[in-house]
Amino acid sequence: MSIMPLIISEKITEVIMSNQAFLDGMREIFHMTDRNNLQNILLHGLQNHYNTYKQVDISNQEVNARREKVERIYGHKIHDYVPFYFNPRNAMLYRNRSNARVIILGLDVRVIKDHRNGFLISNRNASADEAKFSKNLPDLQDPNFINFDDVFSSRWCNNGIANNDIKQKMMAEILINDVVYSRYICSIYVKDQASKKAIKEQLAGDLKMYNINVIVDLAKFF
């Protein structure tokens, strides 16, 4: 089920059609965390940066200072929001590639509509100076605001040269200013069978209660 209705127009461009294709196929948005945080997430929900339940922080401490900035739509700090990515295979995940406990939570896209009165879209890493924000779902269809071909680029570095513009756009975010409860979590993506086994053994009851699948998906990791 797409989160946006299909727009048909004689003037529709190839880029707009590309954006719509991504939206039509979108089933989940993603949040990265450490496996040791899972139990508290399932119990208390996903909360913003200031929550007291987080045991392990995998965020970039240098970037954290920039996420103290205040966005101009609602007047909140970026850290006041729970962050989600369209494309989890980005620079933040790459930075944590050596952490065997890093997992990716896949949340039903309905979480966006259910929190539409307190969410933002950023067209790149929300901490970037060039980041633009919107509270309007239709802007996801506008390639002048966000280009999903860039967001889902396969890489941001070619021949040893980094493209920081693409790097930032691959980290475009959905920001939700509320607790996001476990009922929205559809999947837990891990990089190996050992992680899957550990999670299922530790949290079997919770996984069954919320109907959450634990999936080994190497393609989502580095």
Predicted regions and their residues:
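Active-site-proximal loop/hinge segments that shape catalytic or ion-binding/gating pockets
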Residues: 2-222
